[in-house]
Curated annotation (Swiss-Prot):
Antimicrobial peptide with activity against Gram-negative bacteria, but not against Gram-positive bacteria. Active against E.coli (MIC=5 uM), and P.aeruginosa (MIC=40 uM). Acts by disrupting cell membranes. Is able to depolarize membranes of Gram-positive and Gram-negative bacteria. Also acts as a potent chemoattractant for human leukocytes and activates them mainly through a GPCR, possibly FPRL1 coupled to the ERK1/2 MAPK pathway. Is unstructured in water but become helical upon binding to anionic lipids. Keywords: Amphibian defense peptide, Antibiotic, Antimicrobial, Chemotaxis, Immunity, Innate immunity, Membrane, Secreted, Target cell membrane, Target membrane. Its main location: secreted. This is Dermaseptin-DA4. InterPro entries: Dermaseptin_dom (IPR022731). The keyword Mitochondrion does not apply. Coiled coil: none annotated. The keyword Nuclease does not apply. Expressed by the skin glands. One of its GO terms (cellular component) is other organism cell membrane.
Length: 32
């Protein structure tokens, strides 16, 4: 139902944030 959709969206957002954080860390370490 609606709740599982909201939960899935939250999971996807968390995963995207994690991936973005990893990419940012990689870019910073490469720049250094």
């Amino acid at each position: 139902g609606m709740w599982s959709k909201i939960k899935n969206a939250g999971k996807a957002a968390k995963a995207a944030a994690k991936a973005a954080g990893k990419a940012a860390l990689g870019a910073v370490s490469e720049a250094m």
